[in-house]
Amino acid sequence: MTKNNYKKPFVIAEIGCNHKGDIEIAKELIKVAKIFCNADAVKFQKRNNKELLTEQQYNQPHPNPANAYGETYGLHREYLEFDINQHAELKAYCEEMGIIYSTSVWDLTSAKEISSLHPLFIKIPSACNNNVEMLIWLCQNYKGEIHVSTGMTTKSEI
């Protein structure tokens, strides 16, 4: 990406966890983003749920059981997570399709794992933009761009 050289909007297709934990659905969403939406990039999410959630949060029931993929909120989140090898497969598929791969990282472990894939950029969700340990690690170790969302952040927190 080039900065301050505006020619057209840079479109990022937010896939998030809409793949329902199925890598083939994820690949189909990449294809749709590229072919039908002409997106420049796709973005997934990566969480280490045991690191991100408290034990109580992990073990509580999903707030909407009809939409749950597991007995607890933690198991639901685990079902939706791709491991690092699956993320590498998705990145390779993106390269094959001619679209940029990226991921939002929600914790330090996920930041370390995803940065090992050397994506062009990593996004920090607004819910995690005060995770100082993760931000310092990324600034010191990750060579790509870091995009920080501030949607859930007050001016004083920024």
Regions found by a protein language model. Give the residues of each.
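N-terminal amphipathic alpha-helix/helix-capping segment at the start of soluble metabolic enzymes
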Residues: M1-A13
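Hydrophobic faces of well-ordered beta-strands that scaffold small-molecule active sites
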Residues: V11-A13, D40-F44, Y101-T103, L120-I124, ...
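Conserved, mostly hydrophobic/aromatic
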Residues: E14, A33, I114, S149
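Active-site beta-loop-alpha junctions enriched in small/polar residues
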Residues: G16-N18, Q45-N49, W106-L108, A127, ...
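Glycine-rich, proline-tolerant flexible connector loops at the mouths of alpha/beta enzymes
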Residues: G21, D40-E81, S110
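Active-site-adjacent beta->alpha loops and helix N-cap segments on the catalytic face
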Residues: D22-I23, D83-H87, S110, I124-K143, ...
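Catalytic domains of carbohydrate-active enzymes, especially glycoside hydrolases
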Residues: E28-R47, L117-H118
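Glycine-enriched alpha-helix->loop->beta-strand junction motifs that scaffold or abut catalytic
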Residues: N38, E113-I122, C139-I146
